[in-house]
Structure formats: C-alpha cells, structure tokens
C-alpha cells in the first residue's frame, strides 16, 4: 500500500523513491510488526483473560506443566495481525507470491483457531479431530501446491494460465522448466526433475508437514517461536537472492521473478515473532496456540517451495524435523511392541523430544535455549549452502 502511494507521488517528492528498495521496506516491515505486537500484546492478553481463553493442559504430560493451566492461549492471533498489517503496508500488493503465502498463512491460522476454540470451549486438550484438521490442511496445501507448480515456472499470472492449460491439453503429463526442479544443496548443477505431479506432491508434503512440525514443537515457553524467527529470516535472505537475476546467476540458484518481495513477509514474521516472544518467554503470559503454530509452519513451508529450497528448509528446521520424528517413532514403536508382545513400550520417556529431556531432569529454560542454539547452528549451515557448491 505504501509502495503504491510512494510511487504515485515520487516525482513530486523525490525522497519517496527509497520505497522502491526492497531492503528498506523489509526493515520497516520488521519494525512495524514488532511495534504492533508490543503495543497490542497487553491488550490481547487482557482480552483473552476476560474471555477465559485458558490453555487446557494434558494431565499425562510433565507434572511441572500443570501450573500452566489457565494461561491464555490463541495468542497466535496477535502474530497474524502483526504480520498481516505489516505485510500489507510495506509489500507490493500486485505480487502473486506474497498473496499465496498470506492465503496459506491465514488459512492454516483459521484451522488452528477452530482447533483452539474447541479446546477452550470444551476443555479438551485434543481439540479438533485429527482427521478433520488434516482434511482442511490438505485442502489448503493442495491449493497452494497446484498454484505454485505453475506460478514458480511462469513470470506472470497470464503465463501461469497458459502453462496450466498446456498441462491439461497434454493429458497431465507435461514437464516443468528446470527452475521447478528439486535443488540439491552443495552442487551447482545437480537437481532432480519433479514433473507436475512430483512438484505438487513435494509441495503438499513440505507445507502440511512443516505446519504440523512447528505445532508439535510448540510445547514449551518460547520453544517454537524463536526457531521460526531464525528460519524465517534465513528464508527471507534466500527469497531476496532468488528474486535477483544477478545474485541468482552468481550463486547458481534458480531465479524466480517476484520472489524477492517475500523478504518483506519474512521481516514481518520476524518482527511479530520477536514481539510475541516478549510475552511468551518463560514464564509465559500467553501461548500462541494452534492458530499461530499451524500458520507459521505453513508460511515457512510455502516460502521454501517458492524459493526452491525445500532441502535447505529440512536442514535449517532440523529441530522441527527431529521433534516430529520423535513423535512418529514413539507411536510406531509403541504400536509395534504392543502388537508383538501385548505390552506397548516406549523409546523415549515422553514425546515430543523436548518432554523427554524434561523427564531426564533438564529445566524448561535449558531445553528451550539449547534448542535455540541448535537451530542457530543449523540455520548458519543452511546459509552456507549458498557458497559451498
């Protein structure tokens, strides 16, 4: 919005040309989201307290968490508000990638809001049924996957439609341009052609998987939000470089016209996340709930697909990956041993992994900060793939 206004008056007011620089708008999107989050945070917390939107804590979880019962949840709505306002103010509203990321983010946020609402109203920690939640996530994820399969390969929406029609006319067997291939880090020229169906399947897996992975990680005060900020900031840098023909050619990464605007969304996400951390740091005054965790995870996955860095997301989001695997392995092993011996056994003391370390005697703050440190190292390693080729 501000970009449009600046371009309209820049001939009369020369300094307004600074709005044409993406980096300038990214910085101020970050500051805007941070300011919105810090200003409205206390109001949102008081409102949630009045509405008695308190977290229902699992009785079979760590006993130290029972004291958290009643802490306001659904604070992720504050994050989405800050991201949405800052993005709409500072981004180029004609950019199609910004809109698809916003739609996915708000869509997953809506699913999370319904889940949180049911938890609060019915005092049920499980919330929405898994099948129902997965169904809505799948609808949103598939919508994004089909759209991105062709928009990543086309520099404009008109060419996107031409590409889509050509795919239909080919009997759904058309190949995509090389820029839509799966990029293998550390190699300049090695990539894996996905085809349309492969691209859709991978994109669906990345978006829905990342959304649920962030949600599983969000079990301790500040645990999920800081890794989200770090990974999101790194993806913003990838977006900026991918959107530049010069940098993309120099670094041997695909050039996706228009992807650079996503650094503004990533900046807004970082600012909103830091503002939320102000209130979510131990002892937390508010939890983000599924409305925040599902939305932020969906945003990270969508951006990674657009900038063609799915494998790098897997590296940088290693904490999210390990947390998810810990749950899958725990459940699978329990079912397997119960089927074989009649008694289910567990590999971990408790899943997800952060609860295992709590049961081992780690303080909550120790688990959180150590996971932050691990994420920081993984993000730096992921960024190193830009030059280690």
Curated annotation (Swiss-Prot):
Protein name: Phospho-N-acetylmuramoyl-pentapeptide-transferase
Gene Ontology CC annotation, any one: plasma membrane
Keyword Cell cycle: yes
Location relative to the cell: Cell inner membrane
Main location: membrane
Pathway stated in the Swiss-Prot or TrEMBL entry: Cell wall biogenesis; peptidoglycan biosynthesis
Protein encoded by which gene: mraY
Keywords assigned by UniProt, alphabetized: Cell cycle, Cell division, Cell inner membrane, Cell membrane, Cell shape, Cell wall biogenesis/degradation, Magnesium, Membrane, Metal-binding, Peptidoglycan synthesis, Transferase, Transmembrane, Transmembrane helix
Membrane topology type: Multi-pass membrane protein
Function: Catalyzes the initial step of the lipid cycle reactions in the biosynthesis of the cell wall peptidoglycan: transfers peptidoglycan precursor phospho-MurNAc-pentapeptide from UDP-MurNAc-pentapeptide onto the lipid carrier undecaprenyl phosphate, yielding undecaprenyl-pyrophosphoryl-MurNAc-pentapeptide, known as lipid I.
Catalysed transformations (reactions): UDP-N-acetyl-alpha-D-muramoyl-L-alanyl-gamma-D-glutamyl-meso-2,6-diaminopimeloyl-D-alanyl-D-alanine + di-trans,octa-cis-undecaprenyl phosphate = di-trans,octa-cis-undecaprenyl diphospho-N-acetyl-alpha-D-muramoyl-L-alanyl-D-glutamyl-meso-2,6-diaminopimeloyl-D-alanyl-D-alanine + UMP
Record field: transmembrane: 21-41, 70-90, 97-117, 134-154, 189-209, 222-242, 259-279, 286-306, 311-331, 366-386
Organism: Herminiimonas arsenicoxydans
GO molecular function per UniProt: metal ion binding; phospho-N-acetylmuramoyl-pentapeptide-transferase activity; UDP-N-acetylmuramoyl-L-alanyl-D-glutamyl-meso-2,6-diaminopimelyl-D-alanyl-D-alanine:undecaprenyl-phosphate transferase activity
Source domain of life: Bacteria
Cofactor or coenzyme needed: Mg(2+)
Short name of one Pfam family: MraY_sig1
EC number, as in UniProt: 2.7.8.13
Family: Belongs to the glycosyltransferase 4 family. MraY subfamily.
Keyword ATP-binding found: no
GO biological processes: cell division; cell wall organization; peptidoglycan biosynthetic process; regulation of cell shape
